[in-house]
């Protein structure tokens, strides 16, 4: 069933069920371009200097990339090359697509890390005892509704974008361009605090395309080659609503269509609106920035609790102060899905996890140049990362 332009539908929602929506964006979305460039810069430094202190923000607009931030590192980096390679990998390789890695202007405004921060966080300290790079609060979330312990809404939204990129790169759909957005609404049933996906209610896909392809051809291909290849058939029914290329035309995309900034897709990067978010972005930051490392650790804790059978759904909060190594607080919320109390789960977490940044970096191997891969399709729910390997808990 195709969605109406005014969005109205008469689908009835049964008692005890609810709708939840998550979105994702593709590699060529302007904000995601910036995330990937920031993490490409971080990786370039870590390859040469695993102890580099990096805070790199990126701005993208038509024909221009700006790097801004603070970096202290022994590495010698060719920023022009790093930026252009990242854009080339994304697929902006011709001006007809609105952006070209060969001709864009790359501006660099990078300085040293503030000595005030350095002396307060890591100078003259053992690695285990380094302080948090800033204050803040971070969350980790896990749910047993999927094998990945991630919400189905965000899993499907990411996979739709990944399928678009695959079909673009292998030439199956040559009219595709790198910029894309997806959104998935799932109907859930509540089950004693846990959530059970029943069906996919609505799917939205908007993807950049060339001038020649017609709208009907695009909509047909998106349904047959993208949605049906990604979304399990059991979740689709005759009442599922599709908004495919709802604007009708999306030729101008990427940084030409909208300016891009690092750190503007923090919900896409995490749990798609489930759980909670402390507000700190990930990309372009080394492990001393707890916005990133502690959020990864909190996810590790949450997934370990769910995979260990201690609860079906859980939210973990941690908080830090700049220069202080131990977290100020750790909180566990299990939504009533555990036979143990939240206090008992907290004791298990404290017994099994050391959440100081200098220990997180060792446990999760965060000095390795792995970050550019995290910067598209979500930082969580992908098996290749250490924080996705659940820890066997002792209690």
From Swiss-Prot:
Top-rank lineage group of the source organism: Eukaryota
Annotated PROSITE patterns: ADOMET_SYNTHASE_1, ADOMET_SYNTHASE_2
Cofactor note: Binds 2 magnesium ions per subunit. The magnesium ions interact primarily with the substrate.
GO CC terms in record: methionine adenosyltransferase complex
The enzyme's E.C. designation: 2.5.1.6
Enzyme class: transferase
Pathway noted in the entry: Amino-acid biosynthesis; S-adenosyl-L-methionine biosynthesis; S-adenosyl-L-methionine from L-methionine: step 1/1
Molecular function in Gene Ontology: ATP binding; identical protein binding; metal ion binding; methionine adenosyltransferase activity
Essential cofactor(s): Mg(2+); K(+)
Leader sequence segment: none
Catalyzed reactions per annotation: L-methionine + ATP + H2O = S-adenosyl-L-methionine + phosphate + diphosphate
Binding site for ATP: 29, 179-181, 247-250, 258, 264-265, 281, 285, 291
Region called Flexible loop, residue ranges: 113-125
N6-acetyllysine PTM sites in chain numbering: 81
GO biological process per UniProt: cellular response to leukemia inhibitory factor; cellular response to methionine; one-carbon metabolic process; positive regulation of TORC1 signaling; protein heterooligomerization; protein hexamerization; S-adenosylmethionine biosynthetic process
InterPro entries xref list: ADOMET_SYNTHASE_CS (IPR022631), S-AdoMet_synt_C (IPR022630), S-AdoMet_synt_central (IPR022629), S-AdoMet_synt_N (IPR022628), S-AdoMet_synthetase (IPR002133), S-AdoMet_synthetase_sfam (IPR022636)
Residues carrying Phosphoserine: 114, 384
Record: residues binding Mg(2+): 31
TM helices/strands, residue ranges: none
Function: Catalyzes the formation of S-adenosylmethionine from methionine and ATP. The reaction comprises two steps that are both catalyzed by the same enzyme: formation of S-adenosylmethionine (AdoMet) and triphosphate, and subsequent hydrolysis of the triphosphate.
Note: Protein expression is regulated by post-transcriptional regulation: in presence of S-adenosyl-L-methionine, METTL16 binds and methylates the first hairpin of the 3'-UTR region of MAT2A mRNA, preventing recognition of their 3'-splice site by U2AF1/U2AF35, thereby inhibiting splicing and protein production of S-adenosylmethionine synthase. In S-adenosyl-L-methionine-limiting conditions, METTL16 binds the 3'-UTR region of MAT2A mRNA without methylating it due to the lack of a methyl donor, preventing N6-methylation and promoting expression of MAT2A.
Subunit and partners: Heterotrimer; composed of a catalytic MAT2A homodimer that binds one regulatory MAT2B chain. Heterohexamer; composed of a central, catalytic MAT2A homotetramer flanked on either side by a regulatory MAT2B chain.
This protein's name: S-adenosylmethionine synthase isoform type-2
Top-level taxonomy: Eukaryota, Metazoa, Chordata, Craniata, Vertebrata
């Amino acid at each position: 069933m195709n969605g109406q332009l005014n969005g109205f539908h008469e689908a009835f929602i049964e008692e005890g069920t609810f709708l939840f929506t998550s979105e994702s964006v593709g590699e060529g979305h302007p904000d995601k371009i910036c995330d990937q460039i920031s993490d490409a810069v971080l990786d370039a430094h870590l390859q040469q200097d695993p102890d580099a202190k990096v805070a790199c923000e990126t701005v993208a607009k038509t024909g221009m990339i700006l790097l801004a931030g603070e970096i202290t590192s022994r590495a010698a980096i060719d920023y022009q090359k790093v930026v252009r390679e990242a854009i080339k990998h994304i697929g902006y390789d011709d001006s007809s697509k609105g952006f070209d890695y060969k001709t864009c202007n790359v501006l660099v405004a990078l300085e040293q890390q503030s000595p005030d921060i350095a002396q307060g966080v890591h100078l003259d300290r053992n690695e285990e005892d380094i302080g948090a790079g800033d204050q803040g609060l971070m969350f980790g979330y896990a749910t047993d509704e999927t094998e990945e312990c991630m919400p189905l809404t965000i899993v499907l939204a990411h996979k739709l974008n990944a399928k678009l990129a695959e079909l673009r790169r292998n030439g199956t759909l040559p009219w595709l361009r790198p910029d894309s957005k997806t959104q998935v609404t799932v109907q859930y049933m509540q089950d004693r605090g846990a959530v059970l996906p029943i069906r996919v209610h609505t799917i939205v896909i908007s993807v950049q395309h060339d001038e020649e392809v017609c709208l009907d051809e695009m909509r047909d291909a998106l349904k047959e080659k993208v949605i049906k290849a990604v979304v399990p058939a059991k979740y689709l029914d005759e009442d599922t609503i599709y908004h495919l290329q709802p604007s009708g035309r999306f030729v101008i995309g990427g940084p030409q269509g909208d300016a891009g900034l690092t750190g503007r897709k923090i919900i896409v990067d995490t749990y798609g609106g489930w759980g909670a978010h402390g507000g700190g972005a990930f990309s372009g930051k080394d492990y001393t920035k707890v916005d990133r490392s502690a959020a990864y650790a909190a996810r590790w804790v949450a997934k370990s609790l769910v995979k260990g059978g201690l609860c079906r759904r859980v939210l973990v909060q941690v908080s830090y102060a700049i220069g202080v190594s131990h977290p100020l607080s750790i909180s566990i919320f299990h939504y009533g899905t555990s036979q143990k109390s939240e206090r008992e789960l907290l004791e298990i977490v404290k017994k099994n996890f050391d959440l100081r940044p200098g220990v997180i970096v060792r446990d999760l191997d965060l000095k390795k140049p792995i970050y550019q891969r995290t910067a598209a399709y979500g930082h969580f729910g992908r098996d290749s990362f250490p924080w996705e390997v659940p820890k066997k808990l002792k209690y």
